[in-house]
Amino acid sequence: MTSTKISLTQTVQKGGCAAKVAASELREILKQVKFPAAHPALMVDGGLFDDAAIYKINDEIALVQTLDFFTPIVDTPKLFGEIAAANALSDVYAMGGKPKTAMGILAFPLATLPKEVIVDVMQGASDKIAEADANFVGGHSIDDDTLKFGLSVTGFVNPQQVWTNAGAKVGDHLILTKPLGTGTLTAGLKRQEVQEADIMEALQSMATVNNAVDYMTPVLKNEVHAATDITGFGLSGHGMQLANASQVSLRISFSKIPRFAKALAFLEKGFLTKAHRSNAEYTKEAISVAGLESLQQHLLHDPQTSGGLLLSVSREVSADMVQALRAKFKSAEIIGEVLPRQDKAVIFEP
């Protein structure tokens, strides 16, 4: 453990998933890249902007591959490692799979931070990988000006039980497993307006592994028609992507959305990130926010780090699903439903 107090958020300009390249800008960049033709065994590639790639090996096993890394979103090194790992592991769970191996991705400023920080970050990650019943099998590191850490994760899933963001069915209920608000709360932390202890509920949520699949019976798992995790593009952006991929529309009630107690207050204080604005720009033509106040709209665009899963589930089992999920995810809630395609991809109502 590090012997002196280090505030990692003060060593970077932006942190967590709020540091993502804006979605609209990224799409324009990727349009200029000529990618090779997809192999027939690829069940999911980058075309749908899903959470991970899936490569079918045989009729019983498919490979799930993803990676995620970012700059510090919290001050404590070990907690940063825990959150970075939980965030990377989440993409495998969002596809219905289970992680098996993880490799570390580390950029570290050797000239400005003590090496003990690496130990703490790696230990935090190792603890979460073990919690996911996966193996930490190595990685790669470089000396850099800014600390960055994350994981490349490989998992497995039955090809017949893959979740994607493209399978939502009209009539499904939408379930969100974690509260919103990590973007604005951690913005307050970076501005040194609060201490970690003041927003511990959100920090613990970010460090919570998204293994919702482990709390589902086989029957419940089969009733998940689509899934994605809510991260840097916010509920608005990731919800829009799911609706577009599934060629449906989502109707979501703001009053049903779980949120951290201080989130709206922090937004009112102006604790916004660049991602709040880029997410609003990204989704402005595709979502409806009629009747919502500006602070409520900010929360929809709030960039989540290691946010919850958004599940599109048969309405016949949605109540049972929520009850099962609340064994771990206490805030799991039905927040809306899937509609036939409308003019807007996502319709947010009060």
UniProtKB/Swiss-Prot annotation:
Homodimer. The active site is at C17. The record marks K20 as: Important for catalytic activity. ATP binds at K20, L48, F49, D50, D68, D91, G139, H140, S141. Keywords: ATP-binding, Kinase, Magnesium, Metal-binding, Nucleotide-binding, Selenium, Transferase. One of its GO terms (molecular function) is magnesium ion binding. Its cofactor is Mg(2+). Belongs to the selenophosphate synthase 1 family. Class I subfamily. Binds 1 Mg(2+) ion per monomer. It catalyses: hydrogenselenide + ATP + H2O = selenophosphate + AMP + phosphate + 2 H(+). Synthesizes selenophosphate from selenide and ATP. This is Selenide, water dikinase. The lineage of its organism: Bacteria, Pseudomonadati, Bdellovibrionota, Bdellovibrionia, Bdellovibrionales. GO terms for biological process: selenocysteine biosynthetic process. Its EC number is 2.7.9.3. NCBIfam families: PRK00943.1, selD. Pfam families: AIRS, AIRS_C. Mg(2+) binds at D51, D91, D229. GO terms for cellular component: cytoplasm. It comes from the Bacteria. CDD domains: SelD.
